[in-house]
Amino acid sequence: MQKRPNPRGNPNQDKFAHIRINEQITNVASIRLVSDEGSDIVTLDEALRRAKEANLDLVEVSGDQDVHVCKLIDFGKYKFELLKKTKEAKKKQHVVTVKEIKIRPRIDNHDFEIKKRHALEFLQKGDKVKVTLRFRGREMVHSEIGMNIVNRFVEDLKEHASPEKMPVHDGKTIVVVMNPIGEKPKG
C-alpha cells in the first residue's frame, strides 16, 4: 500500500533549496573562494576541482555581489549547524501574550490582593496584563468606585508595569492594559 503524500509537503524538504552547491552554481565566470588557507578569486572549474580534491562541497554563501562568494565545507555539517542555530534562536524567543485579570467594583481586599499577585506573576514572565472591571445592573450609578479600584490596581503595580494609556470607561467596563517594565522574562 502506497503512502499518501502530505498535503502541506515535507517540512524539512525546502529549507536548504535556496543554497546552491557544487554543480548547481552556474553562470559564473569567477568566484571568491573562502577556505582554511584564506580567500582568493578563482574560476568556477578550479574551485570545483579543489573541492573534489579536499573531499568537500563548494557552497555558495553569497551570490548577490559582483563576485559570488563560495566556501569549501562539508554541506551535511553546514546544514546541521544552520538547523542548530535556528533552533537556538527559536528557544530564546519569548512571545508576549496579553493575560486578562477580571475584577468587580465590589471586590474584597483579599480578593484584590490575589488578583494583584496574579498580575504581578504575569508581568514578571514578560506578558502584558489587561485589567477589566465590569459593572452589573445598578453598579453603573457609582462608576467612580470602579475607576478608583482600577487606578489603585495601576498604582500598586507601578514599580513593575506601566499602563499603555489611562483606564478607559467603555460602556459597562473599565479597561487598562499594562506593559512590564525593566524585567527580563523568566524561563
From Swiss-Prot:
Is Transmembrane helix among the key words of this record?
A: no
> What GO terms describe the biological role, i.e. biological process, of this protein?
ribosome disassembly
Q: What cellular-component terms does GO give this entry?
A: cytosol; membrane
Signal peptide stretch: none
Its localization reads: Cytoplasm
Q: Which GO terms describe its molecular function?
A: ribosome binding; translation initiation factor activity
Q: Which UniProt keywords apply?
A: Cytoplasm, Initiation factor, Protein biosynthesis
What InterPro entries does its record include? Answer: T_IF-3_C_sf (IPR036788), T_IF-3_N_sf (IPR036787), Translation_initiation_fac3_CS (IPR019813), Translation_initiation_fac_3 (IPR001288), Translation_initiation_fac_3_C (IPR019815), Translation_initiation_fac_3_N (IPR019814)
Identify one Pfam family in the record.
Answer: IF3_C
**Family statement:** Belongs to the IF-3 family.
State the function annotated in the UniProt record.
IF-3 binds to the 30S ribosomal subunit and shifts the equilibrium between 70S ribosomes and their 50S and 30S subunits in favor of the free subunits, thus enhancing the availability of 30S subunits on which protein synthesis initiation begins.
Outline the subunit composition. Answer: Monomer.
Query: What is the name of the protein in this document?
Result: Translation initiation factor IF-3
Q: Which organism is it from?
A: Leptospira biflexa serovar Patoc (strain Patoc 1 / ATCC 23582 / Paris)
Print the organism lineage. Bacteria, Pseudomonadati, Spirochaetota, Spirochaetia, Leptospirales
- Identify the gene encoding this protein: infC
